[in-house]
Amino acid sequence: MVEDTASVAALYRSYLTPLDIDINIVGTGRDAIESIGRREPDLILLDLRLPDMTGMDVLYAVKEKSPDVPIVFMTAHGSIDTAVEAMRHGAQDFLIKPCEADRLRVTVNNAIRKASKLKNDVDNKNQNYQGFIGSSQTMQAVYRTIDSAASSKASIFITGESGTGKEVCAEAIHAASKRGDKPFIAINCAAIPKDLIESELFGHVKGAFTGAATERQGAAEAADGGTLFLDELCEMDLDLQTKLLRFIQTGTFQKVGSSKMKSVDVRFVCATNRDPWKEVQEGRFREDLYYRLYVIPLHLPPLRARGDDVIEIAYSLLGFMSKEEGKDFVRLSAEVVERFRQYEWPGNVRQLQNVLRNVVVLNEGREITLDMLPPPLNQMSAPINRALPLAHENKVSVHEIFPLWMTEKQAIEQAIEACDGNIPRAATYLDVSPSTIYRKLQTWNEKVKEKEKER
């Protein structure tokens, strides 16, 4: 309680005795700010007129350091307009002095209960669901699917854009399953060279190929009894897809260089940022393998479709990163919150992580402001419009039509240039995997060479 008249402070303390709460009384704004800095209270009763500063000055100082602490102003009749203005700046309520005991008790009790409920709501929202953060309706549907499917041995096929948390989802499925205490083994089919991925998956014996100095266990054997997660599955070579299908059907496999069959019990979870059925139709993914694995589909929504989850995730990451980097950041400014809500996040949660890491490392303070954000967020004046440009209204002649691969090549090269040669970043904006771009660049180089030979 911040009240400079001792008799009034003593009277109000007696009014609040039945609530069984601890009350600390100070008589100046400076003492109030220092006291709150030492120990954050559950509620502040603040007189509008103080001997050393105004109640509004105290309000601003408190909101700077402890933005979540509720404040109830106490004011005389002539200052009601100021009290209303204070509520616009974050005060929760105001009392007109002199106030009766019942009115004071009800106001204080309601303010404390409201603050406690708000804190519990925030805590509940920020509780991780098996590693996820977010309480949007789209994510609630994901959580329900995980809960329903986790106990089954049926294969789960996770789809979603890059950076949406497909591996987190796979780990959540494993943790919620009966196999949760057994191994979870992940293998990224796009990150391993074609000639090594079979060895990574099934293992190899000594001397199976150059460099195989010792026998090595593969991911399939390591996952025995647990879950085998095949990330970016649609990047797998067709020849290896055949062997994978046999492994799924029989539960047996051979190490590279061995004729001996090994048997394991694994639950398959796989993921891709592509449309798996489209990959089947275009001949890049085996149809029989698709039907074997696409038993329970689970789509992860992009961050832009998750509403205020972006703010929940941002605050969770901010707290972790600030502590890790030894910084004091505790909140986002209102402008940053709005910018985060507007932005389309083409790189999803992974991009949000990178943005916050950049800000925390390169800046100081307690609040993240717009000027701290890296491009393109600090340059946005409106939500990014990622819609494709409209087709040219004028008719084109047949001489102006280019092969589709050349048009695609131009679009990808422009994206790479815009991203300063950073192919993984360009892939994020183009909504494809980096390996897709590398593969296409190689194919186009071969086509250009063929064209030159024809000349």
Swiss-Prot record:
Q: Which residues form the Response regulatory domain?
A: 1-112
Give yes or no: UniProt keyword Transcription. yes
GO molecular-function annotation terms?
ATP binding; ATP hydrolysis activity; cis-regulatory region sequence-specific DNA binding; DNA-binding transcription activator activity
* Highest rank taxon of the organism: Bacteria
Q: Which UniProt keywords apply?
A: ATP-binding, DNA-binding, Nucleotide-binding, Phosphoprotein, Repressor, Transcription, Transcription regulation, Two-component regulatory system
Q: Which InterPro entries match?
A: AAA+_ATPase (IPR003593), CheY-like_superfamily (IPR011006), Homeodomain-like_sf (IPR009057), HTH_Fis (IPR002197), P-loop_NTPase (IPR027417), QS_regulatory_LuxO (IPR053402), Sig_transdc_resp-reg_receiver (IPR001789), Sigma_54_int (IPR002078)
Keyword Ribosomal protein tagged: no
Q: Which residues carry this modification: 4-aspartylphosphate?
A: 47
Q: Which SMART domains match?
A: AAA, REC
Give Gene Ontology CC terms: protein-DNA complex
The residues covered by the Sigma-54 factor interaction domain are 132-361
Q: Which BP terms in the Gene Ontology apply to this protein?
A: phosphorelay signal transduction system; positive regulation of DNA-templated transcription
Q: Which residues bind ATP?
A: 160-167, 223-232
Q: What else is known?
A: In strain El Tor C6706, at low cell density, LuxO acts indirectly on virulence gene expression by repressing hapR This leads to the expression of virulence factors. In strain El Tor N16961, the hapR gene is inactive due to a natural frameshift mutation.
Function in brief: Involved in the regulation of different processes depending on the cell density. Acts together with sigma-54 to repress, perhaps indirectly, some genes.
State the name under which the record lists this protein.
Answer: Regulatory protein LuxO
What's the name of its gene? Answer: luxO
